[in-house]
Amino acid sequence: MSSQPSFVTIRGKAISLETQTESLLSKYSTFAQTTSSEQTGQEKKIDKQLEGILGQRQDVIDSLTQICDSNPAISASKLSQLHRHKEILQDHWKSFRNIRSSIQQERNRLNLLFSVKNDIANSTTDAPAPIGDADEYIQNETRRIDQSNNVVDRLISQAWETRSQFHSQSNVLNTANNKVLQTLQRIPGVNQLIMKINTRRKKNAFVLATITTLCILFLFFTW
């Protein structure tokens, strides 16, 4: 009767599969930079390999988990190694899905641009546009869209920065104003002096308004 594989043996397989996954992810990411209108055979192959190897790694981790659960005296270092393998698997799944999504988004955008190009060509002439011209148009439109997105991002960033500066300056002015008022209130007689100045200004304004009114009435009755 064959004995069950040890923790070290199964962990060695997990490490080997992790290395293979990283190599496949590196190859798979190149398709996001050179996306074609349709999925190539090589892209399909790597996509399928990644799904398969990630599934194998889950089986390996399940085996390691079973060994740890069945052995209460398992060392803390092995439990830590198992936890790390789980984290790496989650990270690789996340990277795989992100790359796949990026490839699909880029492919959809290229197909949309190509469709627009064909519609424009069909509306002007019945002759099909040369493939070289279509590729050049797609590349130019892609660059133009990227440049527009960069400009919008910069404008939004500048707007938020300006808003933050205004908010910061407003807080500084409010703080300074509060400090001045607090300081004036601590100085004896300052509040009374300010009240007297305001009262005197009101009296002067009242006298000036009265004189102006009398002059207008005098001119009105003597004209």
UniProtKB/Swiss-Prot annotation:
Cytoplasmic side, ranges: 2-204
Compartments (UniProt record): Golgi apparatus membrane
Protein keywords: Acetylation, ER-Golgi transport, Golgi apparatus, Membrane, Phosphoprotein, Protein transport, Transmembrane, Transmembrane helix, Transport
Superkingdom of origin: Eukaryota
Modification type Phosphoserine: residues: 164
Bilayer topology term: Single-pass type IV membrane protein
Predominant subcellular localization, coarse grouping: Golgi
An example Gene Ontology CC term for this record: SNARE complex
Disruption phenotype: Lack of late Golgi SNARE proteins, TLG1 and TLG2. Spores are temperature sensitive and fail to germinate at 37 degrees Celsius. 10 to 20% of cells possess a variety of aberrant structures, including fragmentation of the vacuole, a common occurrence in secretory defects, and substantial accumulation of membranes in some cells. These structures are considered to be abnormal Golgi remnants. Endoplasmic reticulum (ER) retention defective, erd phenotype, which is characterized by hypersecretion of ER-resident proteins. This results from a defect in retrograde directed vesicles.
A single GO molecular function term of this UniProt record: SNAP receptor activity
Vesicular side: 223
InterPro entries linked to this entry: Golgi_SNAP_su1
Keyword Aminoacyl-tRNA synthetase: no
A Pfam cross-reference name: V-SNARE_C
PTM-bearing positions, type N-acetylserine: 2
Residues spanning the membrane: 205-222
The UniProt record lists the keyword Zinc-finger: no
A single BP term in Gene Ontology: vesicle fusion
Subunit field text: Component of several multiprotein Golgi SNARE complexes. Identified in a Golgi SNARE complex consisting of t-SNARES SED5, YKT6, and the v-SNARE SFT1. Interacts with BET1. Interacts with BOS1. Interacts with SEC22. Interacts with PEP12. Interacts with self.
Function: Involved in transport from the ER to the Golgi apparatus as well as in intra-Golgi transport. It belongs to a super-family of proteins called t-SNAREs or soluble NSF (N-ethylmaleimide-sensitive factor) attachment protein receptor. Rescues alpha-factor maturation defects.
Family: Belongs to the GOSR1 family.
PANTHER family reported in the protein's UniProt record: GOLGI SNAP RECEPTOR COMPLEX MEMBER 1 (PTHR21094:SF2), GOS-28 SNARE- RELATED (PTHR21094)
Entry protein name: Golgi SNAP receptor complex member 1
Top-level taxonomy: Eukaryota, Fungi, Dikarya, Ascomycota, Saccharomycotina
Encoding gene per record: GOS1
